[in-house]
Amino acid sequence: MANTARIKDLSAVTTAADADILAIDGSNGTKGISYENLSTQTLDKLSSKTFSLSQGTKTLPAALNELYVGSPRNNAGSHNSIYRGVNLGTAYTSAMAAAIQAGTFDNLYVGDYLTINSRVYRIAGFNLIKNVGDNAAICNNMCLVPDASMYSAQMHNTDSGQYEPGSTTNTTEGAYVGSDMRTTNLAQATQTILNDFGSSHVIQYRDWLANAVADGQASGAAWYDCQVELMSEVMVYGTTVWGNTGYEVGCINSQLPLFRLNPEMIHRRFVYWLRSVRSAAYYANVAIDGCAGYNNASNPYGVRPLFFVN
């Protein structure tokens, strides 16, 4: 008796093994082909067939290769070129540290932020201090800047803690290195950041900092240990403005990717100090209206530092 079973009535399977045989009906009759051979032939056909795409006619392998070549890589260069702005959570994690140390920066992009103890720390760039310094090469690293001022402080302290007129209370002698901001007033920010990120992750590095002033401009510099520092005009604006000598630039000598990709992050509607010397009495700042400003050294303005982690 002839087999009258129809294909639709056969037991169904959801997977096929390479050795399974499928029926092929053609001019030479009905024959069998293994699933493995059919798959190989199908892929070969797809690989050689050309398709009309927006960038021209290409085979699938050529199109996929072009897509891969143009895709972002997991390295500092590509991650410095993308502003994402994603909330990364409330803690600096071991996974983040591992991604930084590996130099892949997985799931970390400029503009992403952590909210730790009600403080928002935003990623400002990657590997900005890699291989800088006079006696030690820094490896893979991530730069962060708080969105808000951590507190207000003076560049030159007064007994009142407020602006006081006069050349003795408004002096830039010693430039950034000699300022009360760096010698005393950044200590609170440093301790807060060490507590929030862990002292083993906040990098100590070396930078070339201005340490003398003549004729109202920085006139000397030297190497100093750094950890939590005020930003320079170059880091914020991408150029010098009021601090017009090379002593002001240091080793972090380009605009931070955060500010390059999203200038809105420069302008936060509060005044914050920069490290650059404007004159014998003034240091530079970012003004509340967005201007590249400056003011008397005894004014208490915002402390918005940068730091690096790994």
Across the structure, where does each feature detected by a protein language model lie?
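Collagenous Gly-X-Y triple-helix signature in extracellular proteins
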Residues: 70-310
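Fibrous stalk/shaft segments of extracellular and virion attachment machinery
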Residues: 1-73
